[in-house]
A protein has these predicted regions:
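Localized sequence-composition bias
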Residues: 4-113
Length: 113
């Protein structure tokens, strides 16, 4: 399992409310397998007087199992409901693994015997 971070820079009309950002992880069929959004997480972004800002999303553990995934980034309204802009498949991930687990993610678990 790896860790990673993703920095998103944005520019918006400074007269608009502070926006939100979100990312979605999709598999090769286009199915969204995970997402994260600043609004959903209760994080208020900051922007300067010209409407520019940035946010860094930290993934301490990325529990994806082997496969190819793409990342789409969104700039949203302050309530996270409507996208102002999006960048489809801005990143491609190739995940490898050593074990035999099947599926999309590895679930935290313990065995008791």
């Amino acid at each position: 399992m790896c860790s990673s971070d993703l920095t998103i820079e944005f520019a918006i009309d400074p007269s608009l409310p502070v926006p939100g950002v979100a990312v979605g992880f999709s598999d090769t069929t286009g199915l969204t397998v995970a997402s994260a959004g600043s609004v959903n997480d209760g994080v208020t972004l900051r922007m300067d007087s010209e409407g520019q800002g940035q946010a860094t999303l930290l993934f301490r553990r990325l529990p994806l199992l082997k496969g190819r995934y793409s990342v789409t980034c969104f700039l949203t309204t302050e309530d996270g409901v409507h996208p102002y802009d999006q960048v489809e498949q801005c990143l491609q991930l190739e995940v490898t693994q050593h074990g035999l687990e099947q599926g999309v993610v590895t679930l935290p678990h313990e065995w008791q015997v």
